[in-house]
Amino acid sequence: MTVIYQTTITRIGASATDALSDQMLITFREGAPADLEEYCFIHCHGELKGALHPGLQFSLGQHRYPVPAVGSVAEDNLRELGHVTLRFDGLSEAEFPGTVHVAGPVPDDIAPGSVLKFESVKE
């Protein structure tokens, strides 16, 4: 597998886990505006080394998820802002332009130090 993007969660906003009950995980790079940081999983921004597209694999810690849909601006948001909204709903069409949909259950063990990755499953 080829790693397209990798980063490490450094801290978790006070209200970030609230979105998990709605099957969402919202990330933003370090240095996010304070009013956004409260709702985000903050990470040290990595380099995006390829396109975000359906067919990738997303992983968070030991959890692995297929990516069936990617919104039209999700790649730009990740590259420029370190921001992405992940939806754990398995939809095959992106509901919103900034959303990446993954198939599988919402992880319940996200903590600072958790590694987040997008990988190509084709060599």
Descriptions of predicted regions:
Residues 36-47, 93-102:
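Short, structured beta-strand/loop micro-motifs enriched in basic residues and often containing a Trp
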Residues 1-23:
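N-terminal, charge-rich interaction modules
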Residues 74-85:
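Short, solvent-exposed secondary-structure boundary/capping segments
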Residues 47-53, 58-59, 110:
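Short, well-ordered loop/turn sites that connect or cap secondary structure elements
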Residues 63-64, 71-76:
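Short, conserved beta-turn/loop elements at beta-strand boundaries and strand-helix junctions
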Residues 54-62, 116-119:
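Short conserved beta-strand and strand-loop elements enriched in small hydrophobics
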Residues 32, 47, 63-66, 120-123:
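Short, charged beta-turn/beta-strand-edge "cap" motif at the junction between a beta-strand
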Residues 26, 90-123:
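Helix-rich interaction surfaces within compact, conserved domain-sized segments
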